[in-house]
Amino acid sequence: MKTMLAAYLPGNSTVDLREVAVPTPGINQVLIKMKSSGICGSDVHYIYHQHRATAAAPDKPLYQGFINGHEPCGQIVAMGQGCRHFKEGDRVLVYHISGCGFCPNCRRGFPISCTGEGKAAYGWQRDGGHAEYLLAEEKDLILLPDALSYEDGAFISCGVGTAYEGILRGEVSGSDNVLVVGLGPVGMMAMMLAKGRGAKRIIGVDMLPERLAMAKQLGVMDHGYLATTEGLPQIIAELTHGGADVALDCSGNAAGRLLALQSTADWGRVVYIGETGKVEFEVSADLMHHQRRIIGSWVTSLFHMEKCAHDLTDWKLWPRNAITHRFSLEQAGDAYALMASGKCGKVVINFPD
């Protein structure tokens, strides 16, 4: 029996490496040799420290003890019967939710919002990409354009795709002043994508000066401010002659969400991308009287994720430039500890050829 090394998250801020059997693809499945696998903030929040549940199902933790990693990218090395659209040797990224395929949300191309039986997230309710090989459904695959690296693909499969959907929902265009609050990996990508869409001016806000410096270094931000700066909504209003046309909150923080709302121009769009938490505001004074719109955006669709990959190629923008730390699978414990510290940009686990 051929075996492989795989990483599990038992909780208590630890990583467990195990030797397990290499899976065999069944009908409509492929076996992928992993090349790069990202670590997402949700892995840290919901699994790494402790196995969390949602308010809707408080007695059922989201993580069900599978191989972790929901940002996988690699190369197909074997295929089961019934596969028709891909071939061995194809470089692919994997949409990180495998949906039922038949519910209204799956029909719209959004497996993330699947309401049918059998919905499973790679790395949470089925084996994910923190292993030498990944078993995936052919329907969940997206072909990686030649110009993009495996690291780019891993980042696209969740973080970049999430930012891309927010940019689309916010209808960012060349006439827009864009504000991004929270410059973690998703926020950094939101600025990069806003740049690709031709945004007139891009403003970033974060608690950490290191993240502002990184955004400047990447060339994706025109103006950056610490979140502790006094009077930020007024400063942004003066800079933009009335406020941001589009504000994207990627912080998931109550203060960040309120800042995004209050810094938006009349008739502007506010997109909430960051997960968890709450926000409180005056409905009349902060929203209605300014004719502002609030839009919720959760991950993206298969179609938009594929379009995102091609847009990045056309715009010559490379998500890998925001990766600050790379680890081997054997170093997964160090990778998660660093990601949990917040003292980094994007973190990936890479695999040898």
From Swiss-Prot:
Gene3D superfamilies: Medium-chain alcohol dehydrogenases, catalytic domain, NAD(P)-binding Rossmann-like Domain. Zn(2+) 1 binds at C40, H70, C158. Its cofactor is Zn(2+). Coiled coil: none annotated. It comes from the Bacteria. SMART domains: PKS_ER (SM00829). Zn(2+) 2 binds at C100, C103, C106, C114. Belongs to the zinc-containing alcohol dehydrogenase family. PANTHER family: D-GULOSIDE 3-DEHYDROGENASE, NAD-DEPENDENT ALCOHOL DEHYDROGENASE. This is Uncharacterized zinc-type alcohol dehydrogenase-like protein YphC. It comes from Escherichia coli (strain K12). The lineage of its organism: Bacteria, Pseudomonadati, Pseudomonadota, Gammaproteobacteria, Enterobacterales.
